[in-house]
Amino acid sequence: MTATVSPRPDAADAAPGPGEVVSAQEQARRGGDPARWPEKLPVRDRLSVLFDSGTFVEDGLLATASDARLPADGVITGVGRVQGRPVAVIAHDFTVKAGSWGELTCEKQIRILERADRDLLPVVYLVDSAGGRLTDQMGFFPGRRGASAIFQLQVKLSGRVPQLCCLHGPSAAGGAYMPAFCDWVGMVAGQGSMYLASPRVAEKVTGERTTLEEMGGAMMHAAVSGCGDEVFDADWEAVAAARLLLSYLPDDFRGRPPRREPVEPVRADWDELVPADPNVSYDVREVVDRLVDAGTFFEIKARWAQEMVVGFARLDGGVVGIVANQPSVRSGAIFVDSADKAARFISLCDAFNIPLLFLQDVPGFMVGVEVERQGIIRHGAKMIAAMASAEVPKYTVVLRKAYAAGYYAMCAPGFEPRATLALPGATIGPMSAEASVNAVYANKIAAIQDDAERAEFVAARTVEQQADLNLLRMGSDLVVDAVVPPEALRAELAARMVDAEGWSRTPGRRHHLISPV
């Protein structure tokens, strides 16, 4: 149904009566004509997916009521309940000037963020905006209550309350930073995009010809840039995922995620799931499936930096953040992007009081000219600093191998995990026994002419090196706290996590922001 456009009232017009006010509210609630975008779920239907039925209370519905072309000034703001918990929302209405921002669009967003800051409410952003409304640029751009104030408030809220974003359409120019400041970004395939300049502008500036999907589309940001966390086929799926993710997070930095009734894992059979040969790959998600409550693993940034797997899960009913090396991708080595991915997730868990579980199977940080030029040391330091500074309970499990600085970055004993556990076949050391022999005896090996003699020498030295990496030695020297059969690992972790439920932060320590990737 197409909304009727009323003429702008003149100053000489009589004051509107009650019926006209009600009519104006109804017209504002209808918004524009969604029939022009049949592939999109109307914005108020998105809100129906997000909130418990009948709980949404809206603010500012009559914004720009004097101009019927701008119902609610293109944005819906207010507070509703998600599983009984109050949550603030900013939802752009794509049927009103493509969701673009004017002066009152900014004012409404600022006010709801100020309320979220005051009342410590989680915020969900349903973004679908062409950016600033250039016909109102003096209203939305330069002043104290313009777009910059929105970003200021987002940063202020970072680490204080969860901020989740569903990207249903464009998020253009400066507006692209709205999702970038959020803790999680779900993007709708073929619709969601974020970019600082359109392909047309990019061509004028740089001369390169590209498409919107290639430069700022959902799959690009989820798999290449790391700005997106997941890609969804439909609007409702993205909103439903945000609603689910809220169940893993507390209302604010002072609380803890709600516990649920424990559920047995989806799989219990290990059957040599972790191969003894360190050169044979496996999917660490199969390990996760055997440790956590069935159906509870919520992976973060699954398409980006896939050599590192991170996500939320429930273990015996309690929420835990998982940081795991992925042997099936790049042998689980840590690269620049995977270090950033882990660092941000660790910071997110620490901000919201979620214990961390590190699953180690790591050959170390990647080496070579390319990664050194990319700043692997700097990015690795970012990951180590995030892990070392996290005050939440940390638990480390060495699944198979833990070598070099990768062992440190994945929460080695010196970084004060509550416990360091190991499966029976695990090895720990500066490098593998074979690599150690090549490093220590390189000249001597090269000097042996006879092939058989050389092989015998290398084999003997390798056995010697393996003695130092032996897990019995690690247990004897108290490097590991316990060697646990895989079938008993879930129960062991659950018992240790329950024992640490009374943990508290350093007195006087305040919340910290969650730095963008």
Please give the residue ranges for each predicted region:
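Ligand-binding clefts of soluble mixed alpha/beta catalytic domains
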Residues: 1-517
